[in-house]
Amino acid sequence: MQRVIIVGSTGSIGTQAIDFILKNRDSFLVVGLAASTQTSLLREQAQVLGTKNTAQGASEAAELIEATEADVVLNAITGAAGLLSTYATLKTGKRLALANKESLIMGGKYFLDMTTFKGQITPVDSEHSAIAQAMKSGKFSEVNKLILTASGGPFYDRESLEGITLKDALDHPTWNMGPMISINSATMFNKGLEIIEAHLLFGIPYSQIDVVIHPQSIVHSMVEYKDGSVIAQASVADMTLPIGYALSWPNRALNAVRPLEWGARQRWDFLPPTENSMRSINLARRAGEAGGVYPAVLNASNECAVEAFMAGKISFARIIHVTETVFNLYTKQHTNRESAKNPIEVILEEDARTRELAKTVIENMSAD
């Protein structure tokens, strides 16, 4: 029986995790729940699961993690708000089922150095879960490259990104996700973040991490080995599988999703990223290779741009423009530097500094 804490329990990943746990109650006991919004749903979840320990807000979620005995924490919080929960999980030696990629991207090497056992960070992202499974087929020294697949989002074939509404951007062709990640998928910025995440989780150089468009979202990612073999993980597009894999690690979850129908006629396409999507991907590579606080700065720049789009302050076409502008301004004004402060304090300070810079950029852009 694994004791589980779920932070971000009322969001897309959190609710799917609870559905999975309710079908596997002999294997999991939820000992803590936390969310930032939807208080009534949080109370309902606690009642259904028989969970006494609940918290609301990012700081309270981290406190809950530190104060509660548990085996695994599912961090399903969206965005930079998940940083403190990842920190608290690693600090207390619990296993981390990580859906909140932003926290790892922000914490980088500092968080990796905090791990105390192999598998302490188990990815929930379908792409990284796929890679983790495919890498069991060979030695690290035998890996030639990682190939992250992407659906391409709703606008892959669209030449112009002008006139795209919020409703359009939230309508993902394959996955049912929260608003922030849906928009990040539409701009392909999410894939850029996943490149940084893959580098951190698996230690593969950025030059050996590729992206390919796979509209069907059946092959979730691949590992190419030096002998020419390619090992892929394929399944129906259902987040229950990577959620179940992360919670059940090192074992596989039983009956997580239905198997693929191999007797049915089907088509798997693999296409190159478009010029529009490469802008996001290349920006993420640049931040990742620079390291230090730069990935956190990039993430904050993008979160502000997406929030501005959702608020109607900028167009969809300007999201990556704003992200790139803010990131470039920050890198011109500030450099990575050693600090005697706690790394978490430094990350939070630079995150806040970036958001102030983004606010000015967005206000000036809105006034044009």
Swiss-Prot record:
Pathway given in the UniProt record: Isoprenoid biosynthesis; isopentenyl diphosphate biosynthesis via DXP pathway; isopentenyl diphosphate from 1-deoxy-D-xylulose 5-phosphate: step 1/6
Keywords for the protein's UniProt record, in alphabetical order: Isoprene biosynthesis, Manganese, Metal-binding, NADP, Oxidoreductase
Positions of NADPH binding: T10, G11, S12, I13, Q38, N100, E102, G178
Reactions it catalyzes: 2-C-methyl-D-erythritol 4-phosphate + NADP(+) = 1-deoxy-D-xylulose 5-phosphate + NADPH + H(+)
Residues at which Mn(2+) binds: D125, E127, E194
Residues that hold 1-deoxy-D-xylulose 5-phosphate according to the record: K101, S126, E127, S151, H172, S185, N190, K191, E194
Gene Ontology molecular function, alphabetical: 1-deoxy-D-xylulose-5-phosphate reductoisomerase activity; manganese ion binding; NADPH binding
Protein name: 1-deoxy-D-xylulose 5-phosphate reductoisomerase
